[in-house]
Amino acid sequence: MNQTRVFLIFAWLMVAALLWMEWGKDKAAANAPTPIASQAVPAARDPDAAAPAANVPSAQAIPQAGSPAAVPGTSTTTATATPVAAGAAPAITLTSDVLRLKLDGRSVLDAELLQFPQTKDGTEPVKLLTEDAAHPYNATSGWASERSPVPGVGGFRAEQPGTTFELAKGQNTLVVPFVWNGPNGVSIRRIFTLQRGSYAISIKDEVINKSDAAWNGYVFRKLSRVPTILSRGMTNPDSFSFNGATWYSPQEGYERRAFKDYMDDGGLNRQITGGWVALLQHHFFTAWIPQKDQASLYVLAQDGPRDVAELRGPAFTVAPGQSASTEARLWVGPKLVSLLAKEDVKGLDRVVDYSRFSIMAIIGQGLFWVLSHLHSFLHNWGWAIIGLVLLLRLALYPLSAAQYKSGAKMRRFQPRLAQLKERYGDDRQKYQQATMELFKKEKINPMGGCLPLLIQMPIFFALYWVLVESVELRQAPWLGWIQDLTARDPYFILPVLNIAIMWATQKLTPTPGMDPMQAKMMQFMPLVFGVMMAFMPAGLVLYWVVNGGLGLLIQWWMIRQHGEKPSKIIQANAK
């Protein structure tokens, strides 16, 4: 099978996949399920003050700290809703070198990523968590109980005076303690810790019982969001990157649920020890990461228009004069592979969603590993992309050679195949039998060009998603006119080069026996794909240009290696 057919098959598959995604979005919009009924979104500032949504386990099903609980059922009993505390404390702002958080001690209401501007030339940072009225997105850690007092919305108060706390120059850690003082001597001390250069926020709670009775309750950690409506389009990576909830357990591995069909498979009610739960979008995500040795009930639910991903538990019984503690990390930030690795959380690297399938994700991770090492040497993501394509082409050269060798052998026997077709006329059975005998006699494998293609396809599909999903490439320049690899080429130079390379490759490709109508259609393919790619991210088009250019050189070399003349092929295709 020749190089152009390899390219065109891959391109057709890409277009088919993109069209399928578009159709899926339209179908989902037309047949969107009515959200599961639950309590209305409360008017209070903290959106999670309401009781949990219906069809979730009872408080008794929450795993107890330090003891394995049975996997819960689906009782609809819920814990008592937590009221807004009288005289709620004002919101507090915490600022590190990478994060600016607005919180009330219970919920992170607003989060800005200070090192990620919304636009290439802008100064406004990406806002991941937000109090936006239309599309609120919050992270909450609270306590619930059916019998004992717990903090209400706004119940936590900063121990230190002031409403603004900032990581000072020369400091590596910002520690801000909060406290809730309940009735009868029960208190909960909460400590927020931010580290320089990190998007992981440590939240540690200590329940101190100085009352005369046992205190019972469980901690819950929740991500709640009204998903934004993304502008649809095949050239907009935001619209076909995965947007939804993901979670990980040591037993089941990585799983996910898209916002558009959030409750199609019902709510998630599963007890997991360790693991994590996250809400993903293109380039960024939020996640709750509990302690590895503590069990939680993982829940997916809907609360009115909000999609909720929640961890419930562990539950604690704190005797008089005793205390108990629990800790978790809240990630609010980009999908930076280097920083995710520092968290040392199993499976967290899967939030860089190269694929929902493990084998494709492994291929993508391997390709990014090579790409990042090339970047550490070249210090430019554009040149790193070019270097990666060069390495892939070198590694896959034996397969390309096998493809062309198989195709060249088939072309040499085209006259004999034509004779067989003329001899047997419309008797297809005899024609096929004679053809197979010829293949067997001459040791021709008609599928010889397909096997190398099947091996190459997963690699190039994975590379496509690596370039789409890697936040490291976001707003990264290459050279000259390409100042953002995730934006389209402003002068369409790369798309024009891509059209020229595809046209030249097509002219250099032998097409014996091709139907005249098919041949005419093929002549328009470079223009069709060139126009389609004109509005795609420049990094992707750069990949296509380099890959196509190398393919053209390999095609020329293969033709000469097998005793064929490029000029004759070009003349034959011009007829």
UniProtKB/Swiss-Prot annotation:
This is Membrane protein insertase YidC. One of its GO terms (molecular function) is membrane insertase activity. Keywords: Cell inner membrane, Cell membrane, Chaperone, Membrane, Protein transport, Transmembrane, Transmembrane helix, Transport. NCBIfam families: PRK01318.1-3, yidC_nterm, yidC_oxa1_cterm. It comes from the Bacteria. Required for the insertion and/or proper folding and/or complex formation of integral membrane proteins into the membrane. Involved in integration of membrane proteins that insert both dependently and independently of the Sec translocase complex, as well as at least some lipoproteins. Aids folding of multispanning membrane proteins. InterPro entries: Membr_insert_YidC, Membr_insert_YidC_N, YidC/ALB3/OXA1/COX18, YidC/Oxa/ALB_C, YidC_ALB_C, YidC_periplasmic_sf. The gene is yidC.
